[in-house]
Amino acid sequence: MSRGWQWLVRICAGLSVLGALHAVVNTALLRRPPALPGPVGRRVTVVLPVRDEADQVADCLAAVLDQRGAGDLRVVVVDDGSTDGTAERVAAVADDRVTLLRAVPPPPGWLGKPSACAQGAAAATDAEVLVFLDADVRLMPDAIASAVAVLDDAGLDLVSPWPRQLTGSAAERLVQPLQQWLWATLLPLRLAERSPRPSLAAANGQFLVVRRSAYDRAGGHGAVRGQVIEDVALLRAVKAAGGRGVVVDGSTLAACRMYDGWTGVRDGYAKSLWSALGGRPAAAVGAAAGLSAVWLLPPLAALTGSRAGLA
């Protein structure tokens, strides 16, 4: 093995070890919600954008409506052109806390989800806290009260409780943990929480909790109207407007099965990662090469008998 190759393997192995150590530190510093939160003393509105979620929306709504200590809770379901009977499932829910809103088509320059979220937020005229939720998320009974408690106790403007990710196939079990691993290894959470730099941000749009005042100050979803990864973009907009926010441990608050098998994983990540890399082929190749070098090269070198691969 050439000396240059050995040095490359050593450097990549060292970076891999540093990333793992940083993930351990981040995991220890990750904010965790209280097990027994106090009641929320203000109006909370859950905005639930849906499109063809007939199989999910009833269970999602049931979990939202069963929240404990969530204050004056309201739910705005924004049906974004469903054709599978989603709206009818929502209309059948006999609870006056639920409002069904038929979304108007996105204006030019807007994507569907930001537009639906913006319409839901606009309908929540007296909300002091907004919760944006995906239909495939199942909340635990104290989820909203616990998330708001983190928001208040840490003096934050936005928190993104990362739900426990459920998997049902080998592809999901292999790929889904990489989302958390990326921000755990690369993003210094406590620095990101304090820093005004928008680039230091991680969020998960499955479950977002934001103060209405901070949301409006940031321009709401209008500020991220054309963003595929609108969750991270919204946190960046909040930070750019002077707010503070961070991802927090949501594994005890919510659960979500994001994709159903390899096809969903492939299509979903192809869309989101391509957008994250700016739609540039060179950036995609560079990112894949860099991540593969750091995380795959050292163990492969070790398997072929290289002591350098063992760092």
Predicted regions and their residues:
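N-terminal membrane-anchoring/stem segments of glycan-assembly enzymes
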Residues: M1-V40, Q176-Q180, T185-L189
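Long helical/loop segments within the catalytic core of UDP-sugar-dependent glycosyltransferases
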Residues: A23-N26, R102-G120, V150-R217
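Membrane-embedded multi-pass helical conduit in multi-pass membrane proteins
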Residues: T27, A283-A311
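Cell-envelope/extracellular polymer assembly enzymes that use nucleotide-activated donors
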Residues: R42-T45, R74
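Acidic helix N-cap motif at the loop->helix transition within catalytic regions
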Residues: D55-D59, D84-V93, R102, D142
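Short, acidic, metal-binding catalytic loop of nucleotide-sugar glycosyltransferases
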Residues: A62-D72
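Acidic donor-binding/catalytic loop of UDP-sugar-dependent glycosyltransferases
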Residues: G85, D134-V150
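Catalytic donor/gating beta->alpha subdomain of glycosyltransferases that bind UDP-sugars
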Residues: L151, S160-W183, S213-D216, H221-A283
